[in-house]
A protein has these predicted regions:
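Intrinsic-disorder/low-complexity loop/linker signature
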Residues: 5, 152, 244-245
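Acidic, glycine-rich loop-and-beta core segments that form the ion-binding/anion-interacting portion
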Residues: 1-54
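RNase H-like, metal-dependent nuclease domains and their acidic two-metal-ion catalytic environment used
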Residues: 32-215, 250-282
Length: 282
């Protein structure tokens, strides 16, 4: 049952409206024989809040807050250790946790928060990868993200970006970062280049004598949907921890560009304005 009947403007089925009038609680399942309450909670966690509202509550009138589902406030921002992490990281939107010293380029009222508490023993990460988005046909930017995982939490150590396609200098610099963070797997998007980038990486991996597996992925879903479907469930559950240095690096990038174009290249500016509309990503 809907938490707010206003968006439906009298379009609810009479049976549903009657159930609501008789005391059905918001969020309860309308067909318990098909979906249990626990099943719906699991689906909302897996799909993300905005997609769940669209698919399971048929709400097409998303507010601005729901239209842009990737919020900086859902991140946990702290100094990320290169090799170890605690068992659990607690998020809380208490005003005392707002990081007022970090620059924000998100929507009004959207701030970064530090963790409420770090719990448990500090041990090594379960896995560390480097995700590489190569430039398209060698004409635009290449980006690399260094990410570790432990107990279902993702830790973003560092972002790197390059404007010289996939030159030797770029690939070698990415591999230097792999050595710094003990990366075991390179995840490479192969939409452009037809595997050329992977072959170039293999050559440099052999030369640098690093033990890194290469995992090629090919995206066949529109970029905006792919980004939101991947990130929203993680952000809703507050399981992405970002190093402070990533935010500072992002804000200070492209200093020589005009202010309006600088913003368009910023990671967190793009993230906060990401929606399912085509062209949301420039």
């Amino acid at each position: 049952f809907p938490k707010d009947s206003t968006p439906y403007e009298g379009l609810l089925a009479p049976q549903l409206q009657e159930d609501i009038d008789n005391g059905a609680s918001a969020g309860d399942c309308t067909d318990p024989d098909r979906f249990s309450d626990e099943d719906l909670l699991q689906r909302e966690a897996a799909m993300g809040r905005s997609n769940f509202m669209l698919q399971f509550q048929l709400d097409t009138t998303l507010s601005d807050a729901e239209k842009f589902p990737l919020k900086m406030a859902d991140l946990i921002v702290t100094s990320v250790n290169p090799t170890k992490a605690p068992d659990n990281v607690i998020w809380c939107s208490d005003p005392r946790n707002v990081l007022k010293d970090l620059p924000t380029v998100g929507l009004p009222g959207d701030y970064f928060y530090s963790p409420m508490q770090l719990q448990g023993e500090w041990t090594e990460y379960d896995e560390t990868i480097c995700s590489v988005d190569p430039s398209g046909r060698g004409t635009d930017e290449t980006a690399a993200a260094y990410i570790s995982q432990k107990n279902g939490f993702l830790y973003l150590h560092e972002m790197r970006a390059y404007r010289d396609g996939y030159s030797d200098n770029t690939l070698l610099d990415i591999l230097k970062g792999c050595k710094k963070y003990n990366v075991t797997t390179l995840v490479i998007e192969t939409n452009f280049g037809d595997g050329i980038v992977s072959e170039l990486f293999k050559k440099h991996i052999q030369q640098t004598k690093q033990q890194i597996l290469i995992d090629e992925v090919r995206a066949n879903v529109r970029k905006e949907d792919r980004i939101i479907d991947s990130l929203e469930p993680i952000l809703n559950q507050h399981r992405l921890i970002v190093d402070r240095g990533v935010i500072e690096w992002d804000y200070s990038s492209n200093k020589d560009s005009a202010p309006e174009s600088r913003l368009l290249y910023m990671l967190f500016y793009q993230m906060s304005r990401m929606c399912r509309q085509k062209g949301a990503v420039k």
